Amino acid sequence: MANLGCVEINPWNSKVSQLDFPDYGIIDLDPPEGMDFKNVIRIAKEFKSVLNDAKIPGYCKTSGSRGLHIYIPMGANYTYEEVRNFIKLLCHFVGERLPKIATMERRIKNRKGKIYLDYLQNRRGHTVASVYSVRPIRGAQVSTPLHWHELEEEILQSDFTIKNISERIESEGDLFTAILGKGVNMEVVLKSLLKISCSTCD
């Protein structure tokens, strides 16, 4: 693998045994180059607020590059299209709350320097860097699971590298084990999101 330059690990969202039914949905917070990481954290915290209100479990990790990834367990109960539409809805919620720094515009030139809320990674065959994957960038940064409270601290992508990730896992454990759990009941959480939307309109 080293000879081929295979540094990153980019798995599918589904297992071989259930290829059409993802184990989790991913919200990819993709900032433009030069964007203050504090803005990425602000958006992640807004997602956490929405998830908490709707009682949706969510797990955050660094991308290992510039952004953050938020994973939601789906339990291989829904198709890629259903999961993608669900994640798209969550992105709409947050995009409407933070329109000055967040966008769902696909074309980079039309994003106007905003952070892209990417739900399209939830398509069959699309991938993001795996949890604990090393990224092929200066410093050998690692895509690392976070406690949500760590977003309150002055964290940087460069805090998590190939040199210290083993020590972190020993001290914190594997924070991403739960993403392979039974998953959300989409019908129930959609009703919760509808209530949140209605209360906001009031």
Where are these regions (language model features)?
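Short, conserved phosphate-binding/catalytic loop or strand-edge motifs used
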Residues: 63-72
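C-terminal accessory nucleic-acid interaction domains of nucleic acid-metabolism proteins
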Residues: 4-25, 31-35, 46, 81-202
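Short beta-strand
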Residues: 58-64, 105-109
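Catalytic palm subdomain of template-directed nucleic-acid polymerases
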Residues: 71-83
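Short, contiguous, pocket-lining structural segments
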Residues: 39, 62-64, 82
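Active-site palm subdomain of RNA-directed nucleic acid polymerases
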Residues: 48-62
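Short amphipathic alpha-helix segments
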Residues: 39-51
